[in-house]
């Protein structure tokens, strides 16, 4: 029963990871567009004495939900900043429980953020709130995108935490350590080679 449930959770997590990867790509392109928009506005002010008058608001929205949309991919690829000097020196049987505890705290934090994010969206919806720029964008639009990214992150933490709990009950400590532990130097080198378009193992 636990093995079948573990298989189902792994599939759900993989689906969430694929969605998170797409969201991360969208977030990356948003930052590019944001940089281009700011650059254009600066140059237009300098040489044409004109401004979009909405740069701050639009780029603020892009940065906010772009960051939220990158959370899932950062977690699954273990790209987030980690301070685990002590944890990495623990024996495996203790290390995996430390990883699980950290993930549990992350899930609680994700729930709180998702809960408060949708509360903000609901409040903006009830008051038909709009921004103060010339575009008067309904705040519920960018806020919903922002809350969606946080919610996807929370769902991923719950799926991972459930999967890790079952793995620990089955005694699969190595699998938990590979899932939640820091990336190895080999993994980081392979990622750098892949980004450079070089075959893995090339010097």
Each language-model region and where it sits:
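Alpha-helical transmembrane segments and membrane-interface helix-loop junctions
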Residues: 1-203
């Amino acid at each position: 029963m636990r093995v079948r449930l573990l298989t189902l959770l792994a599939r759900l997590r993989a689906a969430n990871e694929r969605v998170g990867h797409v969201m991360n790509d969208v977030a990356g392109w948003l930052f590019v567009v944001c940089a281009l928009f700011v650059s254009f506005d600066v140059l237009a002010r300098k040489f044409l004495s004109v401004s979009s008058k909405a740069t701050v608001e639009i780029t603020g929205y892009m940065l906010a939900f772009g960051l939220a949309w990158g959370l899932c991919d950062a977690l699954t690829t273990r790209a987030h900043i980690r301070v685990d000097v002590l944890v990495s020196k623990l024996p495996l049987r203790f290390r995996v429980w430390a990883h699980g505890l950290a993930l549990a705290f992350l899930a609680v934090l994700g729930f709180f953020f998702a809960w408060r994010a949708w509360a903000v969206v609901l409040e903006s919806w009830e008051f038909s709130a709009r921004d103060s720029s010339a575009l008067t964008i309904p705040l519920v639009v960018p806020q919903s995108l922002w809350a969606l990214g946080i919610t996807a992150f929370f769902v991923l933490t719950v799926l991972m935490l459930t999967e890790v709990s079952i793995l620990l009950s089955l005694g699969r400590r190595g699998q938990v350590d590979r899932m939640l532990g820091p990336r190895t130097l080999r993994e980081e080198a392979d990622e750098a080679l892949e980004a450079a378009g070089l075959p893995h193992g090339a010097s």
